[in-house]
Amino acid sequence: ARSQNGVDGWQIDSQPTLMPSPKEYPEEIWGIEDPRITFVPELQQYVVTYTSFSRGGPGVSLALTKDFRTFERYGVIMPPDDKDTALLPRRIDGYWALIHRPMTKLGAHMWISYSPDLHHWGRHRLMLEARRGAWWDANKIGLSPPPIETSRGWLVFYHGVRHTPS
């Protein structure tokens, strides 16, 4: 959907804004979902992180756009099993920072990873663990909207699952 002012007068597009492209990006063979959009002033573009699905499971893919009509796709940047991803809107100590939720032997926790170029990611660090016990977020946690920078630090919202999504 598009609007001149972002408040009213919305026009629904006849086609989805970003469609899977499995011939060029085989990790999208079973579809794409769950985009997180971050405007990055340094790039003067929007960075869209999204979940791409293939036989290997959900992975994290990234695309850049200025107009939401054309996209420069980077393809998969975090291999399966990973999702719930967003980029911070500015570099941290010279590196791009990405919050994501890989499924590891440790569980479904939130991690932060760093990249010099948005292609190559490393310095993976556990950021927030799902709680143990009967809490609403005791089994899995994941990032909700992209982080918001405040005068007191980064505000991060997350969702959680105890045993099942319902």
Where are the language model's segments positioned?
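Beta-rich carbohydrate-recognition and catalytic domains
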Residues: 1-30, 39-139, 148-166
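Active-site/ligand-binding surface loops and adjacent short beta/alpha elements
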Residues: 144-146
